[in-house]
Amino acid sequence: MKKLLSKKYRRLLWAGLLACLVLYVLGSLLVPPLAGTQRKSDRQIKLPAPAAERVCLVDGNEEALRWRLRLIRSAQSEIVLSTFDFRIDESGSDVVAALLDAAERDVQVRLLVDGMNAQLHLQGSTAFQALAAHENAEVRFYNPLRLTRLWSANYRCHDKYLIIDRSAYLMGGRNTSDLFLGSGGTTRQNMDRDVVVCGSGSGRGSVAALLGYFEDIWALDTNREFRANGEAGRVLRAAAALRERWAAITGTGQVTPIDWDAETIQAGGVTVLHGDCAARNKEPVLLNTLTALMQGGRERIVVQTPYIICNRAMYDALEKAVGGAAQVQIITNAPQSGANPWGCADYLNQKKAILSTGVSVCEWHGERSMHTKTILIDDRFSIIGSFNWDMRSAYLDTELMLLVDCPELNAALRAETDEMVRQGRLLLPDGTAVEGAAYTAPEMPLYKKFLQPVLRVVIRPFRYVL
């Protein structure tokens, strides 16, 4: 009898421990953001003096990969690369091959990758280990998953930038994978946008500001350094394969020297915008900054975002933008074709609330899902980077946006967004739908017809972490 009772108590004990573990995991993954915090301060909306630098818009995915390889090849002393997602697929392997070649040329390489994605997709790759093992390369993972810090699992590094020799950089919304770079790796490619910036060489300006931000996030004690055994046979073989790959790439003649004067245009000012970089709940510093900038618009504001997932404070931000400008237009993926099922489901739930702010929404459908994050203010300012108009970007993740004062760049982007409106369906604040001249009604895939009604219910309790 005692043995039976003892066995029963052990089962209850294990069941209790398992229940505690499940509650711990679920509670950790659903830590709510500082959704009610919307404090204003001079620190949140005061911008540094803009620097007069040269810029180049990078829209095509093949062009985006080529620019990365050209920048890395041009480096003579230092490379800094930070990315949210890094896959060792075709384009990712090209980038690793270029970085290894740079390290072997005595260029110091520092690489910061979001920890969750690195643990899932990167650290087991022998090609990546070959780079990490090199004496001139240093790799850190931002806030990797730890059982003792599961409550911090939602705090991700969403930045994407590449800095060369403290004099030039590329920043935008693209991850380092075939989904965003190159041409032949996947049929599901997204469309996105980067900007290349060439500094003035003064040691100041936006290049220095971005480097300062990187040094802050690089030094966080929640990061973990990643090292590999460079003498392991499989790592040595991977390194040899990368050298062969790089030789083949450079042999095509596509990785050409950069002619900065011919390939860039002069901007009146370039400013790096960011919020808190620590792995914790964040005040919406960047959201407040973007709101203040949008309030300065007087004619037309265009917001490109893959998805719109707002709380009350973010709806208020849109209302404030509408209060200052004649027209505020959001371009987002049509729910029939958007690549993010969670974002599409939430948009269907929140469509009336979005329109009630006074904005109009263009539901865009194209050959590729849009992953672009851009804000155009009148005919002068363009803001490009990684910030989605959602609560995750506002309160949980690290994000970067680049404010560019350049009417020529703005005009090029306006031409692109005007064409997207021609291809889309525009919803006016009163709910009226206006089809563009080139609009073709998208077909809802069969799986979405069944999935979206379910997701619209399921996501409601935790939409702030989507």
Which residues does each predicted region cover?
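Charged, low-complexity intrinsically disordered terminal segments
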Residues: 2-137, 147-158, 164-466
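Extended, Lys/Arg-enriched charged tracts that mediate electrostatic binding to polyanionic substrates
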Residues: 140
